[in-house]
Amino acid sequence: MMSDASDMLAAALEQMDGIIAGSKALEYSNGIFDCQSPTSPFMGSLRALHLVEDLRGLLEMMETDEKEGLRCQIPDSTAEVLIEWLQNQMTNGHLPGNGDVYQERLARLENDKESLVLQVSVLTDQVEAQGEKIRDLEFCLEEHREKLNATEEMLQQELLSRTSLETQKLELMAEISNLKLKLTAVEKDRLDYEDRFRDTEGLIQEINDLRLKVNEMDGERLQYEKKLKSTKDELASLKEQLEEKECEVKRLQERLVCKAKGEGIEVLDRDIEVQKMKKAVESLMAANEEKERKIEDLRQCLSRYRKMQDPAVLAQGQDSECEGLFHSSSISTLLDAQGFSDLERSTSSTPGMGSPSRDLLHTSAPEEFHTSVLQASIPSLLPPSVDVDTCEKPKLPTKPETSFEEGDGRAILGAAAEVSLSDGVSTSSLQKSSSLGNLKKEASDGTDKAPTDSRTFGTLPPKVPGHEASVDDNPFGTRKARSSFGRGFFKIKSGKRTASAPNLAETEKETAEHLNLAGTSRSKGSQGTSPFPMSPPSPDSRKKSRGIMRLFGKLRRSQSTTFNPDDMSEPEFKRGGTRATAGPRLGWSRDLGQSNSDLDMPFAKWTKEQVCSWLAEQGLGSYLSSGKHWIISGQTLLQASQQDLEKELGIKHSLHRKKLQLALQALGSEEETNYGKLDFNWVTRWLDDIGLPQYKTQFDEGRVDGRMLHYMTVDDLLSLKVVSVLHHLSIKRAIQVLRINNFEPNCLRRRPSDENSITPSEVQQWTNHRVMEWLRSVDLAEYAPNLRGSGVHGGLMVLEPRFNVETMAQLLNIPPNKTLLRRHLATHFNLLIGAEAQHQKRDAMELPDYVLLTATAKVKPKKLTFSNFGNLRKKKHEDGEEYVCPMELGQASGSSQKGFRPGLDMRLYEEDDLDRLEQMEDSEGTVRQIGAFSEGINNLTHMLKEDDMFKDFAARSPSASITDEDSNV
């Protein structure tokens, strides 16, 4: 701005100088033309005037010497022209009278020049002022620019801080979600611990009450022992008096026989004396009978005390189970040796003594059955006191009718109590087994009596040897009955079933076997194995036995109470019979009777009709029309080759041949597996669950069942037109989930449960529909329908390392530019699958040959080259072994039993273990079962007592106790 103003000012001044110079030159003009006119003739002379003025100015400035020197340098011609010109008198055509006009004009121009100079000075001042303002404005502009830059920097910092805050917010939200999950898990654990503590507190209170009762019973026992000791002393004195009286009676009888002929009067006196002595003996016998009643009462009290004492001893023996068991058994043995030997040997011999003892038994027996489950079960574990009683020195014989009636009364009481206890809900099976032990023990106590010695008196009835029980009698009945006894106990331990559980038929059969153990073992085994002869039973015993059989007849509710499988006949169908509605309620249960009868017969001996019906059950009934004439028996299928199946039966489908071969192998194997129970209809529903319903037609045509899923190969899937890599991996992980859950039919989760406590093990069981529900719960409902038919389920999400968030986002069709949505999906996906699965997926992504899993990737079948054509058969065999899901996947975790909470590792007895128990010898099996039963009761007691009962119970497996008992046998 300033430079432009300066230029304008300089141009104006130059113009003014030119105007002034032009006005001076007009004095020499003739006034005809204006000097400013472009056609003026003075434009060339104006220059000459300027040159002359310049010359004058220069000459005035020069000195004389310089002037002389300059003049010498001027050419002569130039000097002559100048002199001639200067001496000319012409006025250049101007009249002398026009000089005033030019003078006025010159004055006016001078005035204009001065005014212009003033204007120029004013303009200069204005220009300077404007320059100052311009400088101020430029300074303000710089300040505003600096402020703008500072504001932009602050804006950038604010954007960076906001981005970091957003990231921190997402991290905090993820942390809050983790904390919520942890809080839910902790809350669940707290509730579990509270429930466990509440149960434990009640059990501890019950144990304390039992201890108080034991202390009270201990005091009563001491009193009873004192009474028993005094009663024994009195009994000994009475026996001595009785011996003396017997000897005296014998002596008097001998004298009476010798002197009857000669001494008639003395005979009469002696008869009177004998009558008096007989009356005295009768009074002694009445007193003896009263003592016997007291002894029987003491014996009943001691038996109840022993039943109450044994569980307390087991509960107090927490530090050493074996010591507690030995202590309880030694106490019972000591009581039997000290208190029961003389009692059983001093049983009354009069006929009237049977009914009072039975009445006393009937009055005291109901009190025995008011004990708890543990109290009722433990006495059956202890060694019977029969051997100890027989080892003592008996003094009095036992009347047969009395002992038999007493045993029958006890048997009836045991059976009646067993019937009343069978209506319980949670402990029915345990009570049945315990009542069985009581029944057997009381029967042995009532019937197995010791023989008398040589000091028996003649007035007492003679000994009947037939009622002496053999030492080798099996207290658990036959081997089959014992196995059912063991199975009942193991089923009690293994599950939480109640008496109303769906397994009805087996429960009834088990109940009847338990009830009839005493009868079957005595009727079949005792007659052949007892070394002592059996006397014919009395009429009273026959009545009692018929009463027992009548009682068992009332208990028989269905045909499952039959004990001999050969005697079972197929009943004809009738409506309204027992268990008419059991089939629909059992769900997955099969026809137990038919399956058992089929398994009893080898498949090679099956008839043609059985084989055909079996093929129809397998879904291969379409081949019966062409191959029915070829099938003779089961042996035909067992010996058939691939060519025979294809030629004779017309099975062209390779999967049908494989299905038949696997089914035949399963029939030949003794192992019972759950995948053999899943038919092809279940597999089609399973395809819906894992999100692959498009293959239902192919799987249904191939009759793919659970066994074929377990042994499914890659070639099998390719033959079923499954060529997608993603679908192969989906089926692979779905089979692995089935193995982990032991091929349970309903292991997959189709509906949401508790969203706050989801674990990766539960996510493994999610179906495709459940995954879509999860997407809706995390605000991705608009993308959830894209998973239909994709094969995405919980097992694929958790177990497959190649399946990650990127694959999930591609399957959901989330665009790559929606980074917030993908980040949101990644956050919830990682929270869902857990840290371990995240680590596996991260390791898989770091591998050098990692390729992102997509829905378009295809499985390339292996091709055989001509170089390997010679080993074609070998190659086919090796390729056939390439399973979709390798056998090692899911086996380790699949062996664990389901149905228990985490942390409760309870070992269940399998069928092989029970069959192994059945194959034991009689004596060894009895001892081992008693040991296992006692060990199980000990473990249950410790579970109820200790705070960490679940972990301790896992450490004390019943199998270890059986092994210890085997080593001690």
UniProtKB/Swiss-Prot annotation:
Residues 543-557 have a biased composition (Basic residues). SUPFAM superfamilies: MPN010-like, SAM/Pointed domain. GO terms for biological process: cortical microtubule organization. Residues 346-358, 426-438 have a biased composition (Low complexity). Residues 606-670, 678-741, 763-835 form the SAM domain. The modification N6-acetyllysine is found at K291. The modification Phosphothreonine is found at T39, T963. It is found in: Cytoplasm, Cell cortex. Residues 439-452 have a biased composition (Basic and acidic residues). There is a cross-link at K440 (Glycyl lysine isopeptide (Lys-Gly) (interchain with G-Cter in SUMO2)). One of its GO terms (cellular component) is cell cortex. Residues 342-361, 381-407, 424-482, 518-593 are annotated as: Disordered. Its main location: cytoplasm. The modification Phosphoserine is found at S37, S40, S403, S435, S500, S538, S560, S595, S753, S757, S957, S959, S961. The keyword Ligase does not apply. Gene3D superfamilies: Transcription Factor, Ets-1 (1.10.150.50). Residues 99-310 form a coiled coil. It holds the Pfam family SAM_2. Keywords: Acetylation, Coiled coil, Cytoplasm, Isopeptide bond, Phosphoprotein, Repeat, Ubl conjugation. Residues 518-529 have a biased composition (Polar residues). The N-terminal coiled coil regions mediate homodimerization preferentially and heterodimerization type beta/beta. The C-terminal, non-coiled coil regions mediate heterodimerization type beta/alpha and interaction with S100A4. Forms homodimers and heterodimers. Interacts with S100A4 in a Ca(2+)-dependent mode. Part of a cortical microtubule stabilization complex (CMSC) composed of KANK1, PPFIA1, PPFIBP1, ERC1/ELKS, PHLDB2/LL5beta, CLASPs, KIF21A and possibly additional interactors; within CMSCs KANK1 and PHLDB2/LL5beta seem to be the core components for recruiting microtubule-binding proteins KIF21A and CLASPs, whereas PPFIA1, PPFIBP1 and ERC1/ELKS serve as scaffolds for protein clustering. Interacts with KANK1 (via CC1 domain, residues 244-339). May regulate the disassembly of focal adhesions. Did not bind receptor-like tyrosine phosphatases type 2A. This is Liprin-beta-1. It comes from Mus musculus (Mouse).
